[in-house]
Amino acid sequence: MAKSVKGTRTEKNLLTSFAGESQARMRYTYFASVAKKEGYEQIAAIFTETADQEKEHAKRMFKWLEGGMVEITASYPAGVIGTTLENLQEAAAGEHEEWSLDYPGFADVADEEGFPEIALMYRNIAIAEKGHEERYRAFIKNIETASVFAKEGEVVWQCRNCGFIYTRSEERRVGKECRSRWSPYH
């Protein structure tokens, strides 16, 4: 039988991070709506994609919990939904804290308490969170430099709906055939 997490600091860390990931999922869903309303289709899609990834992280953390009531003390962002730029800045800061501080610390505690699989989970999720931060910071830069819809040099753009691809420096405002929005094609 596997060692129990009941009553350990690891159990509290699992619940704390589960709550944080669950809340991040919901914030990113709200942020996606704002981005879509502001015309940032690609950013909205990335917020939605990241929200789904945060759900998966929360699921991985939740599966290690063994039931019952666990008391935790934690701080979480409280409720402001701003512009897309402000939301990206908040999201990047939260991701940075997770990958650089929270999850490495939680992994160390899990190792100390004899839970190497949980420690590995935290280290792996930290890698994903770092990628989330980097992606958000790239979008921040694009908004701040007015390069969301225009790039230097030729860029391959793809319609987000029908997949039609073309090359030029500026985004078409709507798709050639289906009238949907475009984003850089990677």
Model regions and ranges:
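Non-heme di-metal
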Residues: 1-173
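Positively charged, low-complexity/disordered segments
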Residues: 176-186
